């Protein structure tokens, strides 16, 4: 079990990674706590072991839950239970659950204490870290949201024991993103430890979760609210990736959309002269050895080009007639570039044609 303690803006964030880390919940056993959790998982017994008086609220784990109406129903439940600002919201589940729980915690009484307990690999390496929370609106992902840091993130490897390999792969796309843009040592570790990682070796998983958490927190600490142009690096692959998600009406898993998005954006970087020759090959090679999609033809769900291009128009990195995109320049390095909107959409059209 390993811990990270980081000061982000005005908040202290503690991350605990490793088997048995759920026991850290006992630190708040005397506090009132609402556990927002995915209906897909049986969690009550595990949580009650450390929080015998917890109030459990099940929600669906999917993009359909990330709606304002869902959050309002949760607000009503907290109001009925007389929650106050000293109480806790604990989000237990995948990225959808921690997004909703974080958004709820940030708006109720202007802020309750928040703990994230990701139960998916994607949640542990990305979604539960960084303080971004939000809900979708008009087919635009996370259009309404807040920045609100959890006081603790608990990444307990026991949740991954029964995780299907396909779910592991969906999270690996984000880990690969860190390696490509920020952390050559992580890229090399992924290159050398494929068998261990895909066989869910606990030490290997702990290593990459811990390293990914450090990488993401190092960026968030410098630019929590995306005002300095640093946090944008975490969006490599996401301009095209989010377009794929929107074009499929969110039927394409996030990790797979980002995987294809990274290839498209790496091609853009190389063709526009911002990346060293060979970067696209490096991206493709690592995605291929982990069995991740690298071409839109490998995505099962249909992707509507009109919806996808509209999502690019609505991209949060869109500024007038350009989009800010973080390009990998070589493995472990990146550069923020202003790319004309029409150029981005042109590359997107090429990438999204099956």
Swiss-Prot record:
Keyword Amino-acid biosynthesis attributed: yes
EC number, UniProt record: 4.2.3.4
GO cellular component, one term: cytoplasm
Places the protein is found: Cytoplasm
Enzyme class: lyase
Domain of life: Archaea
Keywords from the named record: Amino-acid biosynthesis, Aromatic amino acid biosynthesis, Cobalt, Cytoplasm, Lyase, Metal-binding, NAD, Nucleotide-binding, Zinc
Catalytically driven reaction(s): 7-phospho-2-dehydro-3-deoxy-D-arabino-heptonate = 3-dehydroquinate + phosphate
Any Gene Ontology biological process: chorismate biosynthetic process
Comment on bound cofactor: Binds 1 divalent metal cation per subunit. Can use either Co(2+) or Zn(2+).
Pathway the protein acts in: Metabolic intermediate biosynthesis; chorismate biosynthesis; chorismate from D-erythrose 4-phosphate and phosphoenolpyruvate: step 2/7
Obligatory cofactor(s): NAD(+); Co(2+); Zn(2+)
Coiled coil residues, start to end: none
One annotated GO molecular function: nucleotide binding
Transmembrane segments: none
Keyword set includes Secreted: no
Cystine pairs: none
HAMAP family the UniProt entry points to: DHQ_synthase
NCBIfam families, A to Z: aroB
PANTHER family named in the record: 3-DEHYDROQUINATE SYNTHASE (PTHR43622:SF1)
Name recorded for this polypeptide: 3-dehydroquinate synthase
Recorded name of the encoding gene: aroB
